[in-house]
């Protein structure tokens, strides 16, 4: 409590509130069950028999002729005039959804993490609390970890598929993203301004001083190589996890545009919500954005449109606003997915032959049961990007523009020995031994905390934010091509 102060109090209050309020009111549950989304109900066997012109099966005694039971008809023509009834999604309907509890907990946790982060930002604006641990950063870090965990859980679902096609798609894209990440990590900062190399150099310098203080020797080039290998492996893993979310986003985007054919303003917003990954990627390409804005050509002269700190703030706000825009259009994408049931029925009517009643019911029910999976695929990348930006701002010592940006610094590990007083008695000797041990432990913890500089955090979270957008661009563009040309053929 003394270390974190009021932040710990607010954290405990929010955690208690989350535990007590979530069973009664859940933001994630409200997103699905507020009455704006409607599902298509599958037809009963009696309705299908009526549409097919078949009589109701006779009683069990009447169906036996010469000791042989008459088989129950299970198929109907595909071209029957089937029209699906709709019903708003309520809480009881949502309980049968796949991964509904995981979805509800994840969305609620992301919301409370954002609330705590906003509180800590306001607290840091009012109070000089630079020596306190920023508890909001810890919540954002957990949101990032849970976002990746949710995406991995959904990806594992595809790996359990019996057909194996989804598994091959994920592995192919993961290997493809591995190659791209290997290329990106060797691009100089003059083109992609992540700042990974300066940040890694500062960490290695502090680590070398820390190890020398402990009497250890370590090869710094090996540390840099191991870090880059781990970063490339993480990029490939994220690429595999973001494969099907990107493909699904492309499908729901096309379907949402068809639903909004008579609403041009909504179509404009849908197009704008599809472009955020492209804008985020461009924001870190130095010759196109920062160099242009800092030295904009005006005739024969160059004009500085904004400063370096102003551009950093501008980039943070742009990403936050784009994430909020995509979040606000969640309902239209989810409804576009639910309308796949009606589209499938219309496609079935244009085909010849017969189809099982059970298959019709199963297909329509399956679309609704996977609604939360689609919601996680849509919202998890948004939440991941959103909280990566929060981490970039706080740990990278950036500013929202509401107060001056603190200067970046690279703390050097202090190698001075811990001072201790000479004991005067046995009791004082024991007490001072404990104090010396505590001081030594605190000194080691302080040194470990000083290893990771704001320059390093700027590099790592800039890269992660940029990489998530790259994965979304590639997978969603491939999804557009697949659903428009390959899927339609």
Swiss-Prot record:
Q: Which InterPro entries match?
A: Transmembrane_161A/B (IPR019395)
Q: Any signal peptide, and if so, which residues?
A: 1-23
Residue ranges of region Disordered? 413-432
User: Would the keyword Flavoprotein be found if you checked this record's keyword annotation?
Assistant: no
How is this protein annotated for GO cellular component? Answer: membrane
Q: Where are the transmembrane segments?
A: 99-119, 135-155, 167-187, 225-245, 265-285, 305-325, 371-391, 460-480
Glycosylated residues, chain numbering: 34
Q: Which residues lie on this side of the membrane: Cytoplasmic?
A: 120-134, 188-224, 286-304, 392-459
Q: Name one Pfam family in it.
A: Tmemb_161AB
Question: What family does the database annotate?
Answer: Belongs to the TMEM161 family.
Q: PANTHER family given for it? A: RE42071P, TRANSMEMBRANE PROTEIN 161A
Q: What's this protein's name?
A: Transmembrane protein 161A
Q: Which organism is it from?
A: Xenopus laevis
Gene name for this UniProt entry: tmem161a
């Amino acid at each position: 409590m003394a270390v974190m102060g009021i932040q710990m109090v607010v954290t405990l209050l929010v955690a208690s509130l989350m535990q007590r309020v979530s069973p009664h009111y859940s933001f994630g549950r409200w997103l699905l069950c507020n009455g704006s989304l409607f599902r298509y109900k599958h037809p009963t066997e009696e309705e299908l028999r009526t549409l097919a012109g078949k009589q109701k099966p006779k009683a069990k005694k009447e169906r036996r002729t010469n000791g042989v039971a008459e088989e129950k008809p299970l198929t109907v023509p595909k071209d029957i005039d089937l029209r699906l009834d709709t019903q708003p999604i309520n809480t009881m309907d949502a309980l049968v959804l796949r991964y509904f509890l995981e979805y509800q907990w994840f969305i609620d946790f992301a919301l409370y993490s954002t609330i705590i982060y906003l509180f800590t930002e306001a607290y840091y604006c009012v109070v000089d609390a630079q020596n306190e641990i920023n508890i909001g950063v810890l919540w954002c870090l957990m949101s990032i970890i849970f976002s990746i965990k949710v995406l991995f859980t959904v990806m594992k679902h595809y790996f359990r598929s019996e057909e194996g096609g989804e598994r091959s798609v994920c592995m192919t894209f993961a290997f493809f993203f591995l190659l791209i990440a290997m290329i990106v990590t060797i691009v100089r900062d003059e083109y992609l301004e992540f700042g990974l190399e300066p940040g890694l150099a500062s960490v290695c310098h502090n680590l070398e001083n820390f190890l020398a203080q402990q009497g250890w020797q370590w090869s710094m080039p090996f540390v840099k190589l191991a870090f880059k290998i781990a970063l490339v492996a993480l990029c490939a893993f994220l690429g595999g996890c973001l494969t099907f979310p990107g493909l699904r986003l492309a499908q729901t985007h096309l379907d949402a545009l068809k639903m909004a054919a008579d609403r041009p303003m909504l179509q404009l917003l849908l197009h704008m919500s599809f472009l955020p990954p492209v804008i985020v990627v461009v924001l870190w390409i130095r010759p196109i954005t920062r160099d242009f804005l800092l030295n904009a050509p005006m005739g024969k002269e160059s004009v500085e449109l904004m400063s370096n700190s102003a551009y950093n703030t501008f980039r943070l706000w742009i990403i936050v606003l784009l994430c909020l825009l995509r979040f606000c259009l969640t309902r239209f994408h989810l409804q576009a997915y639910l309308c796949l049931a009606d589209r499938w029925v219309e496609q079935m009517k244009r085909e010849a032959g017969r189809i099982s009643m059970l298959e019709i019911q199963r297909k329509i029910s399956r679309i609704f049961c996977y609604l939360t999976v689609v919601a996680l695929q849509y919202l998890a990348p948004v939440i991941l990007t959103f909280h990566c930006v929060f981490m970039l701002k706080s740990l990278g010592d950036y500013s929202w523009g509401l107060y001056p940006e603190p200067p970046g610094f690279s703390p050097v590990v202090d190698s001075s020995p811990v001072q201790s007083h000479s004991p005067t008695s046995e009791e004082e000797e024991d007490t001072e031994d404990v104090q010396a041990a505590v001081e030594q432990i605190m000194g080691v913890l302080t040194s470990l905390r000083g290893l990771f500089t704001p320059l390093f955090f700027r590099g790592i979270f800039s890269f992660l934010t940029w990489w998530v957008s790259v994965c979304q661009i590639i997978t969603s563009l491939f999804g557009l091509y697949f659903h428009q040309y390959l899927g339609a053929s």
